[in-house]
Each structure stands twice: as C-alpha cells, then as structure tokens.
Amino acid sequence: MGIRTFRPYTPSTRHMTVSNFEELSRDENGKRPRPEKSLLQFIHRKKGRNNRGVITCRHRGGGHKRLYRIIDFRRDKRGIPATVKTIEYDPNRSARICLVEYEDGEKRYILAPRNLEVGATIMAGPDAPFELGNAMPLERIPLGTVVHNVELYPGRGGQIVRAAGAGAQVVAKEGKYVSLKLPSGEVRMIRGECYATIGQVGNVDHSNLSLGKAGRSRWLGRRPHVRGSVMNPVDHPHGGGEGKAPIGRSTPVTPWGKPTLGYKTRKRNKPSNKFIVRGRRRGGRRDKSGRAAQ
C-alpha cells in the first residue's frame, strides 16, 4: 500500500493523505471488480442507538451508504484448497478483503493478509501447510510466528487481531494453552485448539493516513466530538462559567457525573484475568484480584 499526498490547492488538501489502492485487483480496463453479489447484505445503520432508539454511543451517525460484506472469520471449510480470485476494498473495516473460491465452487470473503497475491492457494485445517493465509490451530503454529484473526473460543471464529496492519506473535506454549503477544502489548493465554491465520493483516499504512478535513469524518459516520467545557451547565458537568473557565472539579467526569480520563472500569475479579500473563498497561503477571503483580 502506498500513500498519496496532494498539493495545498485548498486548505483541506494541505494535510490530506489517501491510499493509492495499488494492492487492489483491477480488470484489463483498470477498473475494480464489483463485489460478489451473493456475499453482500444490507444492514441497518445503528447510528449509535440501541433497540429502544436511545443513544448509547455518542458522535455516531450519517456516513456514506454501505453494503456489508459477509466475511468468513471461522475458516471452517477444512482441508479444501481455495484460490485467491481478487483483493477488494471493504468500506466496513480498515483491512482489505480477498475473494477466495474453493475447489467445490463455493466463494467466500476472508481478511487479506499482507503480501498475499491473486492466484495464491490457501487452506484451513490442522494439516494445512505452514504458508501465508492458511488457518490452523495455535498448537500447530511454530513459536515466533505472526498470526491474525485469532479465536478466543474454539469454533466461535476470529474475534481479535483483525484490524489493518495488526498481528499477534506466538511467544510460548504451556500445556493446552498458547501465549500470544497482542498488538496492544498484552500477553494472553489462549487455548491451543483455537484457530488463527498465518501472517499480518494487510493495509499496514492505514494508521499513517490523515483525514485532512472534518468532512471525511462525516463520510465515515463520525459526528463532531464536542468538549464538555464549552457546553452549558444543563448539558455537561464541565459546562458554564465566563470564558474559558476551569471545569470546577478535582477530576474530570462524564456527562453523567462518573469519573473518567484514567478511571479504571475493568472489574478486578473478572474471570479472564487469569489468562492475562502481562497486562497492556503495566508489566508483570496479574494476581487473583486483577492487579498487576509487583
């Protein structure tokens, strides 16, 4: 992936950068192929609302119309080779996706690993060869390997390490568990029979892009994020005062009065604490209370 810059002929293009989409497939006329129609699905845009229409996630709404691409996160078609047909853009995620066709004719979308090319053959299963794009149990993957689309529970499908440029490294194996170093720096134990895909997720320069103007955020469905200190007291605890007044509290709070900006929200006795070898914020192993051991 390359990054395209612009001359500052308008204020928005001065700092704007976009992907040049050089990794995407094109036909003989230079046009990108249309997505596979059988794998498209309309999904109602939630706009940050729950089933009662109440805002549960602020600053969401609008954005360009999208069709959801059905992605195969489970990789449950085992032992059957598939050929990569196209590498496509997906408006619903930061990663690229690739269309694969199995020998029996079935087509599926999967996340496109970095450096995977059209025409490559991939496979999923415990006996799959150790090659880029193949999915296999963590217990079968050698130490030091970078993987993505990792399952947390066997058979549930990949739930972590799916964003553009993400990759987790296999660092240890102990009994029926495999330790992974996640992109956040956390080292976590996962059952060895959970599946993962070999390689790093493509589109690695996604984090280096600059939107350049507020309008591009609106295209993505992100509404303005207004600071509480510029609101009125009726709208936020930080609001009110003359000019740029301080918030008037010892610690920042949410619009509903709960502490924020550094306030710990993870339960100390959360059951999954025992699987975290090293936390992403503090070094050392977590004890039974959920705190990092000294």
From Swiss-Prot:
Entries under Gene3D superfamilies matching the protein: 2.30.30.30, Nucleic acid-binding proteins, Ribosomal protein L2, domain 3
Biased composition annotated in UniProt, kind: Basic residues: 264-285
GO terms for cellular component: large ribosomal subunit
Subunit details: Part of the 50S ribosomal subunit. Forms a bridge to the 30S subunit in the 70S ribosome.
Protein name from the UniProt record: Large ribosomal subunit protein uL2
Coiled coil: none
Keywords of the record: Ribonucleoprotein, Ribosomal protein, RNA-binding, rRNA-binding
